[in-house]
Amino acid sequence: YGVSNVKWLNQIHIQDTRYMGRFMGRDYVTLKKENIGGVERWVENSVTTMNLKSSIVRVTEMGGQHEIQGFVLNDGTSIESVEVKIDDGPWGRAEINPRSTKYSWKLFRYDWNDATPGDHTVVSRVTDVNGNVQVTAEELPDKVSRWENYAQFPRTVRI
């Protein structure tokens, strides 16, 4: 597809508004609740900015050692930290893969040294250098679109 990606350049058109081609105007929209003149209304907006998002994708075990792995998506702003929380414990700093680039998915890992048998809740959060922290589900603005669910995503794993 790549409807708004340059392939062959025949002419340049400059505009002062966001390009809303066929797919952007139909598929990349979100509804969010806004207060307009004292009345709450659902307003359609185009998806524009990549918000901070991290998610745990798997927990592996090798030789009795457990490792939590995940990814980060962001808008290219440098990442200050990725942290992992297990059950009600403290946040622990994860290691970001050094091969990650500014706009790429950033992979992270966290050594879970004291894993015990049973069900556990694991969650990650990312913070950028400007102090922005990935929101929790409770802090996520009212939206009804699947495109912008960037809240922390707790997962239950069984050891």
Language-model features: where?
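Extended, aromatic/histidine-rich regions of cofactor-dependent oxidoreductases associated
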Residues: Y1-I159
